């Protein structure tokens, strides 16, 4: 059963049981970190292609974290916010840019987060030394 396309009754039943929700969407401890990283990378690809909006990352993070155990949620959080980057060991300077911050989302749902977009735009890029 796909919880996104299932009947209202089925979705309601799954919403009452996080364990059932996890089974329905196929989310396990092993896939939580992978899905978080894939979610981040999809947002990077979208923004670097010119879609200057980070709200998809925000909403998908909220949807996918539902039903995770605390331990699994920590791994998902770290990977979906890009907290675990790989640094070049030879780099003289390292800057960690992470993403996700609701940025007035409650007051203006149509507004994306400029700092989130900037984090996504610069992911994986190297700055030249001056």
Name these PLM-found stretches.
Residues 1-130:
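N-terminal catalytic or cofactor-binding beta/alpha core of small enzyme domains
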